Every structure is written in C-alpha cells, then in structure tokens.
C-alpha cells in the first residue's frame, strides 16, 4: 500500500513537471543580456539571434519603458522605440524581463506588447518574464509566452525542499513556457525540473576567459536549457548542443 501511494506521488510530481516543448527555439542558445539601449539593440541584433531587455511599465504614462530600475524611465526610451532599432525583429527572439509586472498592470502591459508585435509583424518569438504568477497568468490569456523567474537560493534563505515544493506549485498553477534563473541555480533546475524549458542568465564578465567559455558550453549542452544570457560582445560557436 505504501509503495502504491509513493508511486502515485512520484507520478503526480512528474506530470506537474512536464511541459510540452512546442516553442520553436532557434539553433543558437546564446542570447545577448541586458540590451538596454538603442545602440546595443542595433549592434547586438546583428550578431545574436536572441536579445534580452529589461522593461518597466509606467502607469502614469501608460507606457512600457526600457530600463532596469524605475529611474531609468527618465531616459524616455520606450519599448516600441527600442524595437525600431532591432534589425529584422520578426526574425529574432526576445526575452523581456519585466521589473514591475503585477496583476494590476498585466493586461495593459500585454496589450502594448501585442500591439508592438503586430506592428513589427512578429509572431510567437517573444517571452515575458516575471516572478509574479498571477500577473503572468493574465499575460498568458493574451496568447503571449511567459517565463517564470524562480526563487534564487543564492539570494534568499530558503531550504531546498521548500524551494522545490513552491516551484512545483507555481508550475502547476501557471504552466509557464519556461523557468529562469541565474546559472548558479542550473543544477537544481535540471535535476528537479528537467522537462521544463530552462532559460539561464550566466553571470560572467564580458571577456571570453577560458573558464567563462567552458561554463557557457556546459550550460548549452544540456537539452533542457534553451537559452543562456551572456555579456559577450558576440556569440560563441558551440557545437553539438542538446535541443
């Protein structure tokens, strides 16, 4: 009887962890990190297939601005203007890291993004990232892809068992298109959620040091890992990456 119950629990766990890989990812898993101005957008979009940009929604102006912090909105760079600088946006892939997405502004954010995608003739090549599951559920209703940023054990004092339980609960609630975190969480993510699409931010200097390149290769070769954000000036040529 105990074995039967244990088997059921394991099966339920696997079902929760499963996620259909129905997104058509590009061949290159190496995406440019924090492309937060138009100059970078022009340069990086010529070299990288995928770009990550930080975004902040301004309720006062009902507009999405590019920036990592609230004060960055003073630069006045809207997400729409940023996309104008990207070379052939319909042929690229985008990871939008929303810093203040919540259930109150999620509908407006999604409407703006959908409008941008339509004007740029973009189709299913963009992800919206946040840690707020309620907000992401709203964004999903607009047929947009979502990335769930999981809690980072390197930053917060949470035990591993609690992290696994909480993450599994959020996956079940949201059914995200991918999970994300910095590369320090790589081991836990691929061990406990191997069926999920995993997006990682590799915290490395811009230089192509041997240890940095080795780490990039390691991350990209895992089939669960679909995108790795780097600060290199250009992508690396990595062969035999798992799909």
Per-range role (PLM):
Residues 1-24:
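Bacterial Sec-dependent N-terminal signal peptides
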Residues 18-243:
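Phosphate-group recognition and catalysis centered on beta-loop-alpha active-site segments
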């Amino acid at each position: 009887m105990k074995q039967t119950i244990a088997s059921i629990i394991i099966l339920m766990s696997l079902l929760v962890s499963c996620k259909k890989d129905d997104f058509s990812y590009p061949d290159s898993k190496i995406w440019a990190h924090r492309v937060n101005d138009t100059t970078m957008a022009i340069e990086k979009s010529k070299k990288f297939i995928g770009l990550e940009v930080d975004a902040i929604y301004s309720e006062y102006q009902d507009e999405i601005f590019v920036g990592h912090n609230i004060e960055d909105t003073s630069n006045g760079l809207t997400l729409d203007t940023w996309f104008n600088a990207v070379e052939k946006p319909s042929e690229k892939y985008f990871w939008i890291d929303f810093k203040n997405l919540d259930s109150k502004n999620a509908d407006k954010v999604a409407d703006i993004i959908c409008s941008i995608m339509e004007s740029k003739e973009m189709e299913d090549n963009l992800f919206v990232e946040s840690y707020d599951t309620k907000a992401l559920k709203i964004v999903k209703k607009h047929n947009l892809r979502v990335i769930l940023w999981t809690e980072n054990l390197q930053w917060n004092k949470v035990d591993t068992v609690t992290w696994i339980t909480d993450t599994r609960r959020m996956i079940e609630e949201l059914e995200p298109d991918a999970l994300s975190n910095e590369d320090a969480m790589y081991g836990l993510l691929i061990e406990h959620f191997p069926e999920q699409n995993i997006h990682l931010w590799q915290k490395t200097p811009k230089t192509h040091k041997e240890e940095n390149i080795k780490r990039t290769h390691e991350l990209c070769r895992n089939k669960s890992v679909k995108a790795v954000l780097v600060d290199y000036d250009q992508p690396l040529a990595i062969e035999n990456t798992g799909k």
